[in-house]
């Protein structure tokens, strides 16, 4: 979006209004989830042990819409596909209503990232709704990951769920001659001992009451979140107010970073934008420091010759979701911190959401190290949501 133009329409619309223009099912779901929970908060759960991760997700889950993980820094990560850490996180996501974002930052040739994403020990695609990629390896890796996700989705095994009911038929079930014939056949195959009657007819023969056995079979993906086999006792609850997340998988492109001295320049960011627009069925949006919807090459990299042209129509159609890390609130009455001394540059929710135009603020240590993490998560949720409301009011 050129600085001389009006703000992109996506900045003026509510999350609910943006659902209709979303090309990705998971993006549509996330927009609706944000409205239901009145939250645009992501927790960066950078803890060191699996027990801490699961406990934190359970405590903070009610306040967030996204949980960001780094599985490879977690001690004690259990890789079992049905009872391991990923499966338990998925159960908590269903219970509290949030999506899991594995901050893997894939960057390699296509065949390698496909295997890293869908195979290996972690099998990220199985439990993480969202992951991300650094596209220094080129746009082809994004297409490769999209193909891998689609193949995974198509080959999810289907499980047969069988229910058996036994009952005594009532009179109106046998209103016609055909039904009577069916009863005669059932009398031949239903064991007498299953009968509920011990009465005898006047001629000395046992009376016979037919029991009909009904077998119903339904088919459901074996990895469907609706199946309870992967969740622990007591975690069967599903967040009310919205259906469970779709099984589709999504990608965030790492377009910009907040670390001091970051080498991701305007040319790189423009290549990210092009890759996102070419892969809308898989790319949900960006991890970025500004809103990139409607952005043009001249906005990001004036004079850059990439041999391609971008149309205004393409730019206007953008409806990508944006997430931004480095969000930090000062203690009440104090000034906002500028950074952590290790290269991380902090921003308040108002600066990120209202001014810079991100959709979801990512918070880590600001919540994790607080004396009361759930209360602090609520403080961040309220601030980030107000920043979103202020943005809409400001740009109306």
Swiss-Prot record:
Cross-referenced Gene3D superfamilies: Aldolase class I
Protein's pathway: Pyrimidine metabolism; UMP biosynthesis via de novo pathway; UMP from orotate: step 2/2
Catalytic activity: orotidine 5'-phosphate + H(+) = UMP + CO2
Amino-acid positions noted as binding substrate in the UniProt annotation, renumbered to this chain: 46, 68-70, 103-112, 346, 365
Record GO terms (molecular function): orotidine-5'-phosphate decarboxylase activity
Catalytic residue positions: 105 (proton donor)
Stated family: Belongs to the OMP decarboxylase family.
Protein's name according to its UniProt entry: Orotidine 5'-phosphate decarboxylase
């Amino acid at each position: 979006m050129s600085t001389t133009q009006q703000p992109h329409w996506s900045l003026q619309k509510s999350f609910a209004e943006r659902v209709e223009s979303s090309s990705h099912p998971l993006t549509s779901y996330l927009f609706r989830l944000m409205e239901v929970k009145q939250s645009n908060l992501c927790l960066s759960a950078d803890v060191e042990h699996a027990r801490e991760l699961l406990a934190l997700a359970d405590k903070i889950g009610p306040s967030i819409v996204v949980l960001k993980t780094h599985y490879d820094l977690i001690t004690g990560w259990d890789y079992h596909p049905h009872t391991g850490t990923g499966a338990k996180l998925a159960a908590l996501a269903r219970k509290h209503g949030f999506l899991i974002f594995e901050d893997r930052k894939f960057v390699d040739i296509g065949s390698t990232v496909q295997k890293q994403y869908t195979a290996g020990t972690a099998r990220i695609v199985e439990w993480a709704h969202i992951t991300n990629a650094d596209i220094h390896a080129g746009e082809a890796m994004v297409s490769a990951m999209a193909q891998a996700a689609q193949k995974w989705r198509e080959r999810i095994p289907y499980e047969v769920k069988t229910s058996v009911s036994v009952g005594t038929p009532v009179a109106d079930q046998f209103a016609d001659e055909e039904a009577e014939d069916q009863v005669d056949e059932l009398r031949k195959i239903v064991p007498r001992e299953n009968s509920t009657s011990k009465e005898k007819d006047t001629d000395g023969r046992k009376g016979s009451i037919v029991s009909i056995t009904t077998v119903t079979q339904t088919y459901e993906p074996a990895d469907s979140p609706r199946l309870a086999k992967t969740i622990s006792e007591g975690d069967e609850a599903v967040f009310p107010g919205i259906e469970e997340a779709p099984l589709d998988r999504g990608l965030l492109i790492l377009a910009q970073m907040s670390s001091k001295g970051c080498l991701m320049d305007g040319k790189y960011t423009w290549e990210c934008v092009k890759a996102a627009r070419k892969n809308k069925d898989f790319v949900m949006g960006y991890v970025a420091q500004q809103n990139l919807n409607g952005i043009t090459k001249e906005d990001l990299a004036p004079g850059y010759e990439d041999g391609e042209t971008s149309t205004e129509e393409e730019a206007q159609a953008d409806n990508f979701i944006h997430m931004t890390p480095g969000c930090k609130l000062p203690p009440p009455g104090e000034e906002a911190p500028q950074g952590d001394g290790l290269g991380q540059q902090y921003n308040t929710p108002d600066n990120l959401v209202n001014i810079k135009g991100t959709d979801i603020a990512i918070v880590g240590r600001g919540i994790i190290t607080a004396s009361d993490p759930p209360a602090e998560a609520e403080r961040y949720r309220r601030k980030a949501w107000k920043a979103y409301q202020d943005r809409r009011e400001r740009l109306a």
